[in-house]
A protein has these predicted regions:
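Catalytic core of non-heme Fe(II) oxygenases with the double-stranded beta-helix
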Residues: 1-48, 53-57, 63-67
């Protein structure tokens, strides 16, 4: 399965998304139109929005349905 997020509105200081594995940490600072797709078992979290505006994003999950 895959997960993803599409950022629609990202005011200043709206918070980043962090991905972690056993050996690595990656922080991505979003911008409008950014689409991130990642494996569903990848540890992730969204850092707090410390800005004045609203961060608007759409998160989604894809999985294969077996017949």
């Amino acid at each position: 399965a895959l997960c993803g997020v599409l950022y629609l509105q990202t005011p200043p200081n709206c918070g980043a998304i962090e991905f972690k594995t056993k050996h690595k940490r990656e922080i991505i600072y979003p911008y409008p139109g950014l689409l991130i797709v990642f494996p569903d078992d990848l540890m992730h979290r969204v850092l707090p929005n410390e800005g004045d505006g609203d961060r608007v994003s759409m998160a989604f999950n894809f999985w294969r349905m077996l017949k």
